[in-house]
Structures are given as structure tokens and as C-alpha cells.
Swiss-Prot record:
Domain of life: Bacteria
Job of this protein: This protein is involved in the repair of mismatches in DNA. It is possible that it carries out the mismatch recognition step. This protein has a weak ATPase activity.
GO BP: any one term: mismatch repair
Record GO terms (molecular function): ATP binding; ATP-dependent DNA damage sensor activity; damaged DNA binding; mismatched DNA binding
Similarity comment: Belongs to the DNA mismatch repair MutS family.
Tagged with keyword Cell inner membrane: no
PROSITE patterns assigned to the protein according to its UniProt record, in alphabetical order: DNA_MISMATCH_REPAIR_2
Listed name of the protein: DNA mismatch repair protein MutS
InterPro entries xref list: DNA_mismatch_repair_MutS (IPR005748), DNA_mismatch_repair_MutS-lik_N (IPR007695), DNA_mismatch_repair_MutS/MSH (IPR017261), DNA_mismatch_repair_MutS_C (IPR000432), DNA_mismatch_repair_MutS_clamp (IPR007861), DNA_mismatch_repair_MutS_core (IPR007696), DNA_mismatch_repair_MutS_N (IPR016151), DNA_mismatch_repair_MutS_sf (IPR036187)
Length: 817
């Protein structure tokens, strides 16, 4: 260590405290990294790796910090920001430096690093058989907390459905870290020390939320410890008290339709890397605000199960559908509203920029116009009742911050004139500089008789008097040479040095005073944070309702109606909301189910539209229960407590699970979790094994679903043998996709009708795919032989109805999967 410079010794001492982080060490205009950190940073950011005294070193310009930070965080690293705590020019010895912030993927707050969508993180602990899970978005203040009796695979499914960017685990769950990383490499995982869960949690929670008691919170002590651990972690990373996080709420799963990650993926509800632009979220996203985009995602992931709440949303959408002029007005106004939710979070953390405040002011100026436009519609005139429009906050910003402020106080003008007499005085001194310099220049020209003499300023050398070398012999004795150039000499005089000192003092004073005033501005505005959040939430909801209404008008969606405690479905001329956007002509279809006939076996060849149909029924149910009109001429449907799907074939190479095993595990989840109020959508279950095994399993699954679970189900299959169930069981209906056979081949009409598909048309699909004619003809020969030799029909007709009690007694055996 003796051969290390004082600065490197300082770096190593600070790095020792933050071993798990990349340390960005402020040196002048750069954030430098050293040793192993420098190698990582150089590789990730593709910047030059240099050396300082033989040690690896890589630097980031301070003005481009956010761009580089985002890339480091996206690469899965934790980053500690070490700032200079004093001016290097006035420092005697080594500059004082301290870490002022720690960033992780789940603790980003800076506008330049945030996407519009939520950045959810989670903290997970386990107590007995219960997982205690907190989900939070630091950038918005959203905070959820609940206990779950999950199996490990259910926990992983829950995690994947949220699109988390970071997971915090208690030490006893450390083994989960690897499994989570197998799930996705995009999640940053951190193990928390035990002190985060210390016994002072109640006092700390009461202090944070400024309450005298926690009795009004519906949480046990173990859950409150998790909530407190979240807040402590945020305080540690931000080096400040956390005031903007809302009180945690339970997930209240009974109030929302259950959608697991399989269903979200299978129905194309949210965008993934492979289906961007072609999901339910994408086609409903005509929102105009960032808050509205996040609220739309929240609505889609949590369809309501309470009829009154659904109808309340639908009423608002209907009022907007019937008022196209209001729709257009709101569209224009909402487009001017900035991300108030995140601005309020930054205000609370004292990290809002001057441009944030102007964005807040400009947005608050629009709110009265939004409210005024709603008064023209009796059904919406009370939408903002009880919400503060924050006139005082708007006027305060208006009177304090200039219209086009610098990026931060100290980087240019931020505070308006008239706010501080002292600040105005120093600014006047600074602003009069040109006049002072011109007076000095004029006087020195007259005094020296050097007409070409000029007074100027240089960032390095400061103020100077410039004289050509030809005239330099005329300068008086009081001129002190400062710099020699090729054709000129530069000098200084005592008066110029005094001006420079006064200017430097003025500049420093302006920075200090502006920073002090700005901090007071943020402190004053922090009293409005709760009101800003409430206003933001109402604007977000209005934005979503307006989006639903516009989509409904443009694409001729109709208001759904609901039948409670019934299996009856009457959907006329339904369409797939996404597919219809990408085809020239979409064939609509009907669906009728009743209390007596609620299980459909749907047969038809590949490419005929089976999968599209079952997906559109699922999406229509989701749309209805989020409060949106639906793509159908008429829709009378139940309110489902969950939608369960098994669609598509895939294996799990990492876990060593075959396609069939994955399929059976997913079906097992459905059989365990579905209720008589659920919707089950199955596509080609059983095809991952032999034909006879597949038919047998599919048949048994079907019997269990309609005899024991008694839930609305559509089972799309190639196994035409399954349709014989419609002859044996009154609950089952056989439907098929209509196909027209012509001399030139097969035409898929995509229309559903009663009956059984007699042909899978696999050979015809192969022909359409461009198979050689020799293979097509040979396939026909083989099919003819197999059709003559295999007669499953006679066997299936002999299957007897299995006693329902037998299923009920064996129901627990499903837990083996």
C-alpha cells in the first residue's frame, strides 16, 4: 500500500465498504473506475481501458452519467456513486469524497433512465409454509404485500408474471437465487443481511409513515417486517428517508381474475420480445400519458370479479363512446400531461429537477381544462370530485422557477428574479461584467495609446489584457505577463484581478443561494406529494377509459353484459381483437353455452382457426372484466374467477422436462386450481405422447373437468375420437371448423359449426407448405392403410361413465404433479 497514491488509497478504503457494487469515483469531470471494476466497465460500456500508475482505469464523463448507468444496471450490476464533497480548487490535500447513492435495477428514479412501464421489484421471505412477498415500484411508490401458500414452482410462476427487474431474498431463501436466474437472466437478485428484519420494525414503520399506531393495517408481524425491510433497503440505497412509498396493500386476489404466466403468454395479453405490437395491451394502448400506460397494464393484469365495479367502469367508457367530441378534447389535453406520478416521487426524495417542476406546473395548468370538458357530460362531471387540482402548488412554481430552467441549480439560471434580493444582487454584479470589462478596456486603451488592446477571458487563465507583440513594448510597468502566444502577449493588472475575484465570489454565491432556495422549493412542494399522487391516479384512470372508448368506437366493440352464478354464454359474431388488425378479412364466430352444455370439444385441421377461436374467447372475457367493450355484436358472459390455458407445445431444457411432462404439469395446475366459476381453454392436450395414450389422458382430463370441476371449457383437439363424449355426456357439445373441399384443394372457412371434423387435412397442409409431390402421394397411401387397420371408434363407444365420487376421492392424487 505504501507505493499507492493518497487518492487511490482513498478509493480502496471506500471500495472496501461497497464490495458488491461497481464504484463510480468522481474525479473532476469524470467518474472513474479502477482495477477489476474498470475491466468490467470497459467491457460492458465498450469504453477504453487505460492505466494510471500501472492500475487499470476507465472513466465516464459526468454529463453522460445516466446513459452509462442505465447500461450497467441493465447488465445486472449494482452501482455506487461516489461524489466530491468539496471544491477541488479550494481543497487543501485530498478532496473529501463520499458515496451518496447506490443504484440497482429496482431503485432507479431518474427520468432519463426510466421507461414508461413500471419497474417492479420484490422482497421475498418464508415463514413456515408461507412466502411473505412484497412487490414495489420505487419510481411510483406502488407497494403491495401479502402471504402465499405457494409451492416453489408456483412462486416462480408468480415472479415471472410480474416482469420484475430485481428480487431481494432473505438468507434462508438463498438457494432460490440460482433458480430465479434460470428463469431469466434479466432479474437482479440480492441476498439481504439479517439486520434488515430486526425487531425495531414497528417503530421504524410508524416513523416512516408518521402514524401513532399500525393497528389499522391488516398485516401480521412477519408481514410488517417484510414491509419494513423494503423501506430500510431503499433508505440504505438512497441515503435518505423514504416518504413517497404508499402504505402497502394486499393483492386481494379474490377481487381479481386469476391469470397465471402461462395464460398471460398463451393469450398474448402483454408484450414479450417475440410478440411486440401484437398483444391485447398493444391494441388497447391509445393512452396519452405515462401514468395511463402503467394503469392500463395494471387493469389488464387484474380483471375485476365484482360486477358492480365492472359496470361502474363500463358506464364511464360508454359515456365516452357516446361523446366523440369529448373524446377528442380529452385526447388533446391528456397529451400535455407529464408523468406526475414519478415527478411526485422525485420531489419526495428531493431529487426532482427544475424541468420536473416546470413539467408539473404545465400539467397542472391543463387539469382545469380537463375538468371543464367533463362537465359537459352528466355521466362524467363528478369524475374529479374530491381531488385537489393543486392551484397553490402551480402558482408557487410559477412564481419561483423560470420557464426554461437549467438542468440543475448551479448549472445555470433556475430561480426567478424577485425571489431573493441577495441572489438578484449577485446576479446584477455578474450581469454587469461586460460593462465593467468594456470600461477597463476603454481606459487602458486611452492610457497606453494601444488601439488594438483587448480585454478577454479564458477558462484556464481567467481575465487578461491582450496586446500584439508589435505593441508589447508600450505596456506600462504595472502589467504582469500571464501568457505568451505566437502573435500576442497577455497580461493582467490589479484591477482586473479584483474583478475576477469578485466574479468568482459572485458565481459561487449564486450557485450556493440558488441551491439553497431550490432545496426549500422542493421541501415546500413535498407537502403536496400525496395530493399529486391522487390526482395522477385519477388522470391515469381517465386516460385508460378514454383509450377503451376510442378503441371501441373505431373497431365497433360492444358493451358486454354479465350473467352471474351461471355457465351461460351467448357471444354473437365475436372476433379476435388482435388478429383482426392484421388480416384483410376476419371471420366472426358465435359461442353458446348453457348450464346443461358447457364443455366444447372443438375439432378441425391445423390452420383452420381453432387456436385463434379459443384465444379470442379468453381475451373477450378479460376485456369485459377490465371494463372495456368487446369485439362482438353481442356478449352475455359469466364473470370468471380465473382463466386457465394449456396452449402450444414446449419443453423445458434447463429443468430436463419433456414436452409431455411440461404439458401434464400445466394441466395439473389447471385441475387443482380451476373452480366452477373458471374458464378453461385447452389446445391439443395429449399430443406429446403416443396417440392412444394421448386420447386416454385427454378423455380422462375432460371427464374430470365437466364432472368434478364443472367449469366452462373449450378443448381444441385433433383427436376426433374425443367428440364421442358428446354422445355419452349431456354436458359436452361437439363443434368443428367448417372446411370446403374443392377440386383444387381445401379451403378453410374459419367458421364454427356443430359436428365433428372427419379429416385433419395434415397432408393438405403439407401440400400447401410446398412438400414434394412424391411425399404427398406416399402419405396418402400410408394414411389409407392406417385408417383401415385402426378402429378406435368401437372401443370408445364401450367406455362407461365413471362415477363422479371416484374422481372426488382421488382428487388429492393430482397433487403428485
Amino acid at each position: 500500500m505504501s507505493d499507492l497514491t493518497p487518492m487511490i488509497k482513498q478509493y480502496l478504503k471506500i471500495k472496501e465498504e461497497y464490495k458488491d457494487s461497481i464504484l463510480l469515483f468522481r474525479l473532476g469531470d469524470f467518474y472513474e473506475t479502477f482495477f477489476e471494476d474498470a475491466k468490467k466497465v470497459s467491457e460492458i460500456l465498450q469504453i477504453v481501458l487505460t492505466k494510471r500508475n500501472g492500475n487499470p482505469m476507465a472513466g465516464i464523463p459526468y454529463h453522460a452519467l445516466n446513459n452509462y448507468l442505465k447500461r450497467l444496471l441493465d447488465a445486472g450490476y449494482k452501482v455506487a456513486i461516489c461524489e466530491q464533497m468539496e471544491d477541488p480548487q479550494s481543497s487543501k490535500g485530498i478532496v473529501d469524497r463520499k458515496v451518496t447513492r447506490i443504484l440497482t435495477p429496482g431503485t432507479i428514479i431518474d427520468e432519463g433512465m426510466l421507461e414508461e412501464s413500471n419497474r417492479f421489484a420484490a422482497l421475498i421471505t418464508k415463514n413456515g409454509n408461507l412466502y411473505k412477498i412484497a412487490i414495489f415500484d420505487f419510481s411510483t411508490g406502488d407497494f403491495y404485500l401479502d402471504s402465499f401458500d405457494f409451492k416453489e414452482d408456483e412462486l416462480l410462476d408468480f415472479i415471472s408474471s410480474f416482469g420484475l427487474v430485481q428480487i431481494l431474498l432473505s438468507k434462508e431463501l438463498e438457494q432460490l437465487s440460482k433458480k430465479i436466474k434460470n428463469l431469466t437472466n434479466e432479474i437482479y437478485v440480492e441476498i439481504l443481511d439479517e439486520w434488515y428484519f430486526s425487531n425495531n420494525f414497528k417503530d421504524h414503520l410508524k416513523e416512516t409513515y408518521e402514524v401513532l399506531s399500525l393497528d389499522h393495517l391488516d398485516y401480521d408481524d412477519d408481514e410488517l417486517k417484510v414491509a419494513d425491510a423494503v423501506l430500510k433497503y431503499l433508505e440504505v440505497t438512497q441515503f435518505s428517508k423514504i416518504k413517497h412509498m404508499r402504505l402497502p396493500k394486499r393483492f386481494k386476489t379474490k377481487n381479481y381474475m386469476f391469470l397465471d404466466s402461462n395464460t398471460i403468454e398463451n393469450l398474448g395479453i402483454l408484450p414479450t420480445n417475440s410478440n411486440k405490437g401484437k398483444t391485447l395491451y398493444d391494441i388497447l394502448k391509445l393512452t396519452k400519458t405515462s401514468m395511463g400506460n402503467r394503469k392500463l397494464r395494471e387493469f389488464i393484469l387484474t380483471p375485476l370479479t365484482d360486477k358492480e365495479n365492472i359496470e361502474e367502469r363500463l358506464n364511464k367508457v360508454e359515456h365516452l363512446v357516446e361523446d366523440p367530441l369529448l373524446l377528442e378534447e380529452l385526447k388533446e389535453y391528456l397529451a400535455s400531461v407529464k408523468d406526475l406520478e414519478r415527478i411526485s416521487s422525485r420531489i419526495s426524495l428531493m431529487k426532482a429537477t427544475p424541468k420536473d417542476l416546470i413539467a408539473l406546473k404545465d400539467s397542472l395548468e391543463v387539469v382545469p381544462y380537463i375538468i371543464e370538458s367533463l362537465t359537459s357530460n352528466p355521466g362524467l362531471s363528478d369524475f374529479f370530485d374530491g381531488v385537489d387540482v393543486l392551484k397553490e402548488a402551480k402558482e408557487f412554481i410559477e412564481n419561483t422557477i423560470i420557464e426554461e430552467p437549467a438542468i440543475a441549480p448551479g448549472n445555470g439560471k433556475v430561480i426567478k428574479e424577485g425571489v431573493s434580493g441577495e441572489l438578484d444582487e449577485y446576479r446584477n454584479l455578474f450581469n454587469n461584467l461586460d460593462g465593467v470589462l468594456k470600461d477597463i478596456e476603454k481606459r487602458e486603451k486611452e492610457k497606453t495609446k494601444i488601439s488594438s488592446l483587448k480585454v478577454g477571458r479564458n477558462k484556464i487563465y481567467g481575465f487578461y489584457i491582450e496586446v500584439s507583440k508589435a505593441q508589447s513594448s508600450k505596456v506600462p510597468d504595472n502589467y504582469v505577463r500571464k501568457q505568451t502566444l505566437v502573435n500576442t502577449e497577455r497580461y493582467t493588472i490589479k484591477e482586473l484581478e479584483e474583478v475576477e475575484q469578485r466574479l468568482a465570489l459572485s458565481e459561487e454565491k449564486i450557485k450556493v443561494i440558488e441551491k439553497d432556495i431550490y432545496d426549500k422549493v422542493l421541501t415546500h412542494l413535498s407537502q403536496y406529494v400525496d395530493k399529486i399522487e391522487k390526482l395522477s391516479n385519477k388522470i391515469a384512470e381517465l386516460d385508460v377509459f378514454r383509450s377503451f372508448a376510442e378503441v371501441s368506437r373505431v373497431y365497433n366493440y360492444k358493451r358486454p353484459t354479465f350473467v352471474q352464478n351461471s355457465k351461460e354464454i351467448k357471444i354473437i359474431n365475436s372476433r379476435h381483437p388482435v388478429v383482426e388488425r392484421f388480416v384483410d378479412e376476419f371471420t366472426p364466430n358465435d359461442l353458446f353455452l348453457s348450464e346443461d352444455k358447457f364443455y366444447i370439444i372443438l375439432t378441425g385441421p391445423n390452420m383452420s382457426g381453432k387456436s385463434t377461436f379459443i384465444r379470442q374467447i379468453g381475451l373477450i372475457s378479460v376485456m369485459a372484466q377490465i371494463g372495456c367493450f368487446v369485439p362482438a355484436e353481442k356478449a352475455e358472459i359469466p364473470i370468471y374467477d380465473g382463466i386457465f390455458t394449456r396452449i402450444g407445445a414446449r419443453d423445458d431444457i434447463v429443468s430436463g422436462k419433456s414436452t409431455f411432462l411440461v404439458e401434464m404439469l400445466e394441466v395439473s395446475t389447471i385441475l387443482n386450481k380451476a373452480t366452477d366459476n373458471s374458464l378453461v381453454l385447452l389446445d391439443e392436450v395429449g399430443r406429446g405422447t403416443s396417440t392412444l395414450d394421448g386420447i386416454s389422458v385427454a378423455w380422462a382430463i375432460s371427464e374430470y373437468l365437466f364432472q368434478v370441476k364443472r367449469c366452462n371449457t373449450i378443448f381444441a383437439t385433433h383427436y376426433t375420437e374425443l367428440t364421442y363424449m358428446s354422445h355419452i355426456y349431456e354436458e359436452v357439445a361437439a363443434k368443428r371448423i367448417k372446411v370446403l373441399e374443392t377440386m383444387d384443394g381445401v379451403i378453410f372457412l374459419h367458421k364454427i359449426e356443430d359436428g365433428t371434423s372427419d379429416n385433419s387435412y395434415g397432408i393438405e397442409i403439407a401440400r400447401l407448405a410446398g412438400f414434394p409431390i412424391e411425399i404427398i402421394e406416399r402419405s396418402k397411401e400410408i394414411l389409407s392403410q392406417l385408417s383401415n387397420r385402426v378402429d378406435l371408434e368401437s372401443r370408445l363407444k364401450r367406455i362407461k361413465n365413471i362415477n363422479k365420487k371416484k374422481y372426488e376421492s382421488q382428487e388429492n392424487q393430482l397433487k403428485m404433479f
